[in-house]
């Protein structure tokens, strides 16, 4: 099965959002925000569709890995200097009707704390979202999606940053990221980490067809 990476197009929004909904269905952050599994699985695709819309409006760069006509994984990057515009923030507000009212205060507090911790300086590529369809997880899709972009960072001598739940910290450490700030979500929510990656010497561009 030949896998390849390409830039996402607008028509990928639906399939990619559905994929991300499946990928994050059991993620501790979303379990914390939407504890009811049925509601969570029903509403996450809409949440991610809004996020992908923000990415499209904001000039973010979204990579998808495909095979046999299917999207296996999706990575959303915010380029150096990008910042949400008023329009993007309004689009982001469209996600909140998808949060159960009983969890609205928790969701607002949680995402405010994570957003406040998001790195701003120095300039960097920010990994906004990375998800792999569950049947393709642990088959190299996530690493394959990130490797070309990180090689591009190395070549350009650019930093990269992200925010991750604790379970994924070792994966990102293996790619050169270092945890620099612990985010303790109030109310005993899931711990997250701000992670930075400095460019590695001798970086070379990696082809986007991965196997």
Feature names for model-found ranges:
Residues 128-137, 160-170, 186-192, 197-198:
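Conserved beta-strand-loop-alpha-helix junction that forms the acyl-donor binding cleft
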Residues 123-125, 152-165:
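Conserved GNAT acetyl-CoA-binding A-motif
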Residues 143, 155-157, 166-183, 188-189:
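Conserved active-site alpha-helix within GNAT-family acetyltransferase domains
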């Amino acid at each position: 099965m030949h896998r390849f990476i390409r830039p996402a197009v607008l028509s990928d929004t639906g399939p990619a959002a559905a994929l991300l909904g499946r990928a994050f269905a059991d993620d501790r952050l979303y379990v914390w925000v939407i504890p009811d599994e049925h509601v969570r699985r029903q509403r996450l695709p809409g949440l991610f569709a809004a996020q992908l819309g923000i990415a499209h409006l904001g000039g973010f760069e979204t990579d998808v890995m495909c095979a046999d006509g299917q999207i296996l994984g999706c990575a959303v990057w915010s380029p150096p200097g990008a910042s949400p515009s008023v329009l993007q923030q309004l689009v982001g507000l469209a996600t909140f009707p998808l949060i159960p009212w009983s969890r609205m205060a928790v969701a607002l507090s949680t995402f405010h704390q994570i957003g406040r911790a998001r790195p701003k300086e120095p300039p960097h590529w920010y990994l906004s979202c990375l998800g792999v369809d569950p049947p393709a997880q642990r088959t190299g899709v996530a690493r394959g999606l990130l490797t070309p972009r990180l090689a591009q960072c190395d070549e350009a001598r650019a930093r990269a940053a992200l925010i991750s739940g604790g379970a994924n910290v070792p994966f990102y450490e293996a790619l050169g990221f270092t945890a620099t700030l612990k985010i303790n979500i109030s109310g005993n929510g899931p711990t997250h980490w701000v992670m930075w990656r400095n460019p590695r010497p001798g970086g070379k561009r990696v082809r986007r067809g991965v196997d």
